[in-house]
A protein has these predicted regions:
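Conserved small/polar residues in nucleotide/adenosyl-binding loops
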Residues: 199-201
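Transmembrane alpha-helical segments of multi-pass membrane proteins
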Residues: 43, 196-197
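Transmembrane-helix bundle of Major Facilitator Superfamily
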Residues: 1-181
Length: 201
């Protein structure tokens, strides 16, 4: 199986999605920083998950129309800005708005990542490619909590967002070098399979 730029970008995006579990470790610190009740912290998760779930399928369909590569690049840019916003939020309300933007951009990224995987390899290699993609996502899920714990030992809760800003820079460079920003790149000939769209819900 030939490893292409779009495939690498998709796998890096999968790893990124798993790393968001680092946020859970920061809940006590976020609660204290914004002086909110413990019951309110659930909105940190709800604001992200609800936005992500609602927009995931439309993002995949939009990728079918204008190219999954361009949608991926847009998602990467907005996600990076969302991490900066989360890190600099001065109030809980602004922080939740940042989480909404993070959920929306993650929908753009993961709504197109499975399509990038399948479109970048031959049909014969698609099962293996999707398996590698799933493994990178699982690696992110496994690493998120330990990474979050290490960051909180050294810095404030904002670090669980700030450390991903450089990651997004690397991901954006990789996407641009792969030509994903060009019109029509990685455009599906057929609508994205429902299973692939739901793989990250």
């Amino acid at each position: 199986m030939k490893i292409s730029g779009p495939f690498v970008v998709a796998c890096l995006a999968g790893l990124l999605s798993g790393l968001d579990t680092s946020v859970n470790i920061a809940f006590p610190a976020i609660t204290a920083a914004f002086e909110i009740d413990v019951s309110q912290i659930q909105w940190v998760v709800v604001s992200f998950v609800l936005t992500y779930s609602v927009l995931l399928l439309p993002a995949g369909r939009l990728g079918d129309r204008i190219g999954h590569g361009r949608i991926m690049v847009i998602g990467i840019v907005v996600q990076g800005l969302a991490f900066v916003w989360c890190s600099l939020a001065s109030s809980f309300e602004f922080f939740l708005l940042a989480r909404v933007s993070q959920g929306a951009s993650m929908a753009l990224i993961l709504g197109t990542a499975p399509a990038l995987v399948t479109l970048s390899v031959s049909e014969r290699h698609q099962p293996r490619a999707l398996g590698i993609f799933a493994m990178t996502t699982a690696a992110g899920l496994a690493a998120g909590a330990p990474v979050g714990g290490l960051l909180l030992q050294a810095w404030d809760w904002q670090s669980v967002y700030a450390f991903r800003v450089p990651y997004m820079g690397v991901l954006l460079v990789a996407a641009l070098l792969s030509g994903l920003h060009r019109p029509g790149v990685m455009k599906s000939k057929q609508p994205l399979d429902l299973f692939l769209s739901l793989i990250h819900i």
